[in-house]
C-alpha cells in the first residue's frame, strides 16, 4: 500500500496461461530430445530441482505426444492405402496408346464442328472490310506526313 502512494505498484506474480505453458513445455521437451546432450548439460539437469507440479505436466505432454504420433501414423496409413489403391488401378488399366487409338478411329471420319465448312467467306460483301484501301484523301494526307499507310 505504501508503494502505491509513491507511484509504485505492487509486484504481482505473472499469471500463467496453462494451455500455452503446456505447449511451450512440450516444445522444450521435443527440443531436448532432438539434440544430443553433452556431459556438461547432463550435470546441469541433475542439479536442477524439479517443479512440484512438473510430474503432471510431463504426463500430459507424454499423452499429447502419443496422440500426435498416433494421428500422424493414421494419416500415413491412409495415404499409403490411397497410393496402393491408385497403383492397383494403374496396373489394371489398358495402355494409353490403345485409348488414343480408339479416339483417333472414332473421330477420323467426322469434320470438326467448330471449323467452317466453306472454304471462302460466307458473305462476299464482308470481304471488302478486310481489304486494303486503294486510295483515299486521308491516306494521301498520311503519306505526305511520312507514314507507312500508303
Swiss-Prot record:
Residues 1-11 have a biased composition (Acidic residues). It is found in: Cell membrane. GO terms for cellular component: plasma membrane. It comes from the Eukaryota. Residues 71-137 form the G protein gamma domain. Residues 1-59 are annotated as: Disordered. Keywords: Cell membrane, Coiled coil, Membrane, Transducer. InterPro entries: G-protein_gamma-like_dom (IPR015898), GG1/2 (IPR045878). One of its GO terms (biological process) is G protein-coupled receptor signaling pathway. Residues 65-97 form a coiled coil. Guanine nucleotide-binding proteins (G proteins) are involved as modulators or transducers in various transmembrane signaling systems. G proteins are composed of 3 units, alpha, beta and gamma. Interacts with the beta subunit RGB1. PANTHER family: GUANINE NUCLEOTIDE-BINDING PROTEIN SUBUNIT GAMMA 1, GUANINE NUCLEOTIDE-BINDING PROTEIN SUBUNIT GAMMA 2. This is Guanine nucleotide-binding protein subunit gamma 2. It comes from Oryza sativa subsp. japonica (Rice). The lineage of its organism: Eukaryota, Viridiplantae, Streptophyta, Embryophyta, Tracheophyta.
Amino acid at each position: 500500500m505504501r508503494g502505491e502512494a509513491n507511484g509504485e505498484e505492487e509486484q504481482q506474480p505473472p499469471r500463467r496461461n496453462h494451455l500455452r505453458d503446456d505447449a511451450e513445455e512440450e516444445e522444450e521437451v521435443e527440443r531436448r530430445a532432438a539434440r544430443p546432450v553433452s556431459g556438461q548439460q547432463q550435470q546441469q539437469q541433475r542439479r536442477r530441482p524439479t517443479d512440484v507440479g512438473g510430474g503432471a505436466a510431463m504426463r500430459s505432454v507424454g499423452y499429447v505426444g502419443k496422440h500426435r504420433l498416433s494421428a500422424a501414423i493414421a494419416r500415413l496409413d491412409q495415404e499409403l492405402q490411397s497410393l496402393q489403391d491408385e497403383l492397383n488401378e494403374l496396373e489394371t488399366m489398358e495402355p494409353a496408346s490403345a485409348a488414343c487409338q480408339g479416339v483417333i478411329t472414332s473421330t477420323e471420319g467426322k469434320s470438326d464442328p467448330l471449323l467452317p465448312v466453306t472454304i471462302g467467306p460466307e458473305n462476299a460483301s464482308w470481304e471488302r472490310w478486310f481489304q486494303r484501301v486503294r486510295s483515299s484523301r486521308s491516306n494521301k494526307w498520311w503519306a505526305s506526313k511520312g507514314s507507312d499507310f500508303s
